[in-house]
Swiss-Prot record:
It comes from the Eukaryota. This is Thioredoxin reductase. It is found in: Cytoplasm. The active site is a redox-active disulfide bond. It catalyses: [thioredoxin]-dithiol + NADP(+) = [thioredoxin]-disulfide + NADPH + H(+). Disulfide bonds join 140-143. It comes from Pneumocystis jirovecii. GO terms for cellular component: cytoplasm. Pfam families: Pyr_redox_2. NCBIfam families: TRX_reduct (TIGR01292). Its cofactor is FAD. Homodimer. Binds 1 FAD per subunit.
Length: 327
């Protein structure tokens, strides 16, 4: 099968790109993945309960429902959505070649590829994590910290870098107390962030500490089992929230070694846009954004990728017509 443009990924970036491309009558094909990176089609928002910071929903909206609406709009304008995972992609020349997980013997081609596979938060994979995921455990304080289950409660953050410091400081707006659990005896955060963190009256840093288990009543998290790695003393910490701030992994394994990426694996784009060092290959959303990582910024990035892809295809079509008329 040959397509003018395919989109790999089904989060806000992928669907927004699809909507713009479909409205331009380019008949985009969107591969939404089948539990790619352990996440269902729709990306990280499908694991989020209330989304309260996406414009247009003053009362908030459930993450899975928001992604259903994205998908519905993509289909409405003519996007062909395939519930399949792209397992191999060859960017050596155009049209680009790709293969799908269910049939790796069949090669497909596309003139343009929009990569919107996102990034996923690193987890601790501790006992109780699955039970209390989005029931007290989260990987995004900005996304979830204002939720009713966290307001006026004692909360905890795991990590030692700038992200952990930022998330801890953010949570002080809603929490009565924030515990920052740091595995080492010092922070990796910048001096400025560390100073703000250590001087905040609501924040207490617990050094040399790891989380062993998350515990609760079967419905909501209410405490953690923690261990001091120097003394080996195990104790319980009573908190209603545990936020992971131990980094993200961009889902770029498909293209590493082919397209320019930074040291952390994020695709490098040009001048804040979606263009990469390979003509016809665009990146959108968290796959190229290690700073903001919000649904609304991903959607904006997808818009740019859709418009850029449309413009490239239009320019190339115009050049073909000029060459044809010369003959």
């Amino acid at each position: 099968m040959h397509s003018k443009v395919i989109i790999i990924g089904s989060g806000p970036a992928g669907h927004t790109a699809a909507i713009y491309l479909a409205r331009a009558e380019l008949k985009p094909v969107l591969y939404e993945g089948m539990l790619a990176n352990g996440i269902a089609a729709g990306g990280q928002l499908t694991t989020t309960t209330d989304v309260e910071n996406y414009p247009g929903f003053p009362d908030g909206i459930m993450g899975p429902l928001l992604m259903e609406k994205f998908r519905e709009q993509s289909v409405k304008y003519g996007t062909c959505i395939i519930t399949e995972t792209v397992s191999k992609l060859d960017l050596s020349k155009r049209p680009f070649k790709y293969w799908c997980e269910s049939d790796e013997n069949t090669c497909h081609t596309a003139d343009v590829v929009v990569m919107a596979t996102g990034a996923y938060a690193r987890r601790l994979h501790i006992p109780g994590e699955e039970t209390y995921w989005q029931r007290g455990i989260s990987a995004c304080a900005v996304c979830d910290g204002a939720a009713p289950i966290f307001r006026g409660k004692c909360l905890s953050v795991v990590g030692g870098g700038d992200s952990a410091a930022e998330e801890s400081l953010f949570l002080t707006r809603y929490a009565t107390k924030v515990y920052l659990l740091v595995r080492r005896d010092k922070l990796r955060a910048s001096a400025v962030m560390a100073k703000r963190l250590l001087n905040h009256p609501k924040i207490e840093v617990i050094w040399n500490t790891v989380v062993l288990r998350s515990l609760g009543d079967g419905h909501l998290l209410n405490r953690l089992e923690i261990k001091n790695v120097k003394t080996q003393v195990v104790s319980e910490l009573h908190v209603s929230g545990l936020f992971y701030a131990i980094g993200h992994e961009p889902a770029t394994a498909l293209v590493r070694g082919q397209v320019e990426c930074d040291d952390n694996g994020y695709i490098i784009t040009k001048n804040g846009g979606p263009e990469t060092n390979i003509k016809g290959f665009f990146a959108a959303g968290d796959v190229q954004d290690k700073k903001w990582r919000q649904a609304v910024t991903s959607a904006g990035s997808g818009c740019m990728a859709g418009l850029a892809a449309e413009r490239l295809l239009a320019e190339e079509e115009e050049m073909k017509n000029i060459e044809k008329n010369k003959k």
